[in-house]
């Protein structure tokens, strides 16, 4: 791969384009009622990041984890603003995901493999935690798959009144729709690779939690997505400070570390 980062022409062009793009992004209003320790999330091997459950291989350092957390949070918030929920908590899932992907692309992430489909469940009921683990099983192997499973278990083992579980429920459920993502970040050849699966649930009945409860297969529509994206940390370093400035105090409202 050519060393684009050392090319001053590339750096200047990328900086100008990304600066304009980031400045123009609309984000939801800041909600100071929700607060968590962002530093705890960076120090943890797994975390809640808005509607995403993310875990990190042991060889990723704090800066790399921070880059993943900040960039994917900014992309989620921009998509939330572009595709808001209606009075039933529903929104344009494909539009949301396209906006999310667009933002990541403009921050230096490159998509390697993406898929989106209507997910079929065999049987009369299912739980979303088992479904998303089944989906991500096709992306991950060995230790990475164990990380994903441990992240789900860490969330499941939280007390019902734990503020982290409350944060996750608030971010992933809205009356008749739920949206979660589970992924693992690893380091390969100097790049950060993020493999993740997403699950989107639409139902005619209101619900307050998407994981660890039984849903009847007759009451919902279920969609799934997978993606593998990579980030060159040197490229991201060009926009790192601006992303942090754009997020400002929002980070503490959406991140929470998990013990695995």
Predicted regions and their residues:
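Aromatic-residue detector
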Residues: 104, 129-133, 232
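C-terminal assembly and membrane-engagement modules of membrane-active proteins
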Residues: 1-84, 89-90, 97-98, 158-260
